[in-house]
């Protein structure tokens, strides 16, 4: 399945170019809370997109009056939907598919919070809240709104499986093309920070009060983030019409579940291992073929040990280069699989390996460590991207360089 285009917005940049620059220069996106109205300002670091909602409306190209299913006036569209539109539009522009209207085009978008930021604003105003804000609450709303803005008419659906949501959206999008249902799919996900997510993760006591350090022996937890990331997947027939040949394909995908706990990974990493193993089998590869792993790597004690244990079981004795880009973007929840898929495709396209920021102390339980420097011109053939969510929902994607 060819990847024709990518689009992204995150705490380290409003587009692909800005995000790549931050990755190359080791510029993380964590900071004090600026836009979310919460009692935790100046107490808990997060990785917010560096733009107000009004600025996001400008970037998304929405006017004073919002057309489409949202209706109403500017200022009422959820942050989740705005982030989604910005990244999805960049992905389509990047793909530059000639005569897109001639192809069966769909969108598979993921998120976990929907328009909850607007719902929270509604309830904060008591009886003065505007009911239109609540209409955007459910997860499918942002997908519908973005599809309308982009003129996508053939197919739209929403996936919400916690932190593996976007990876599952990409895998499902590929299936739609493989089975001849669609020719082009915009696949990925989006999520905005909300009080609900910040309060919930704080209640679980897995937030780091400093900037997170995934896969470090002294890690203390994760930093929440927000953003959106999308790929444009195309059939062979569409790929043949592109002026520039796609240099990357989605060669494998798998979803598994360890059925262990609602908010924790199994200590033996069984779900993670099964997802990675099956994705490799479906791509026709061996563990030794993987050149780089974009780790799920949240920075929590449980997640990193479970993922690391699964990697040791599957890859020993030869471990590929690996790192967690959540050390840049924070954990963007439903958007993380999409954002990290974009980074994985860029790694295949350009031969990049990203650093695992703030890593100092190896985990004593693991025989490997992540990369700590940005590496250029690496002969990358295959990249694995891991996304492991609450409820034991584990997904792995494999991206491969096209054979000449």
Describe the function of each predicted region:
Residues 30-86, 104, 112-172, 181, ...:
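Conserved catalytic cysteine-centered active-site region
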Residues 1-70, 237-249, 342-356, 400-404:
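ACP-dependent fatty acid/polyketide chain-elongation machinery
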Residues 11, 112-113, 162, 298-300, ...:
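Glycine-rich phosphate/pyrophosphate-binding beta-alpha loops
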Residues 1-4, 27-32, 40-44, 207, ...:
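Condensing-enzyme catalytic core mediating Claisen C-C bond formation in acyl metabolism
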Residues 42-47, 118, 192-214, 255-274, ...:
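Active-site-adjacent elements of ketosynthase-type condensing enzymes
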């Amino acid at each position: 399945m060819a990847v024709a285009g990518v689009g992204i917005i995150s705490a380290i940049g409003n587009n692909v170019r800005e995000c790549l620059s931050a990755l190359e220069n080791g510029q993380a996106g964590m900071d004090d809370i600026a836009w979310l109205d919460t009692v935790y300002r100046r107490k808990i670091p997060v990785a917010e997109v560096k733009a107000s909602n009004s600025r996001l409306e400008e970037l998304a190209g929405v006017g004073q009056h919002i057309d489409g299913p949202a209706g109403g006036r500017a200022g009422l569209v959820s942050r989740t939907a705005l982030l989604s539109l910005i990244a999805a539009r960049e992905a389509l522009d990047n793909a530059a598919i000639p005569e897109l209207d001639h192809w069966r085009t769909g969108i598979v978008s993921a998120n976990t919070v929907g328009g909850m930021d607007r719902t929270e604003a509604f309830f904060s105003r008591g009886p003065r809240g505007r009911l239109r804000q609540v209409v955007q609450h459910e997860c499918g709303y942002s997908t519908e709104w973005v599809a309308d803005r982009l003129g996508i008419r053939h197919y739209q659906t929403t996936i919400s499986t916690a932190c593996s949501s976007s990876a599952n959206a990409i895998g499902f999008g590929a299936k739609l093309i493989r089975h001849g249902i669609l020719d082009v799919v915009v696949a990925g996900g989006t999520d905005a920070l909300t009080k609900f997510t910040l309060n919930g993760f704080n209640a679980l006591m897995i937030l780091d009060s400093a900037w997170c350090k995934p896969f470090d022996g002294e890690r203390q937890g994760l930093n929440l983030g927000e953003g959106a990331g999308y790929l444009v997947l195309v059939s062979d027939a569409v790929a043949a019409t592109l002026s520039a040949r796609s240099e990357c394909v989605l060669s494998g995908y798998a979803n598994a579940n360890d059925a262990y706990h609602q908010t924790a990974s199994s200590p033996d990493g069984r779900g993670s291992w099964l997802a990675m193993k099956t994705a490799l089998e479906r791509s026709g590869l061996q563990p030794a073929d993987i050149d780089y792993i974009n780790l799920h790597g949240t920075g929590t004690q449980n997640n990193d040990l479970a993922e690391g244990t699964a990697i040791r079981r599957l890859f020993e004795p030869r471990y590929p280069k690996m790192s967690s880009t959540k050390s840049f973007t924070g954990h963007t929840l439903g958007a993380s699989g999409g954002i990290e898929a974009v980074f994985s495709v860029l790694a295949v396209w350009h031969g990049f390996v990203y650093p695992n920021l703030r890593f100092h102390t190896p985990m004593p339980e693991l025989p490997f460590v992540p990369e700590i420097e940005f590496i250029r011109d690496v002969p990358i053939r295959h990249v694995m991207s891991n996304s492991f969510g609450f409820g034991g929902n584990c997904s792995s994607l494999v991206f491969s360089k096209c054979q000449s």
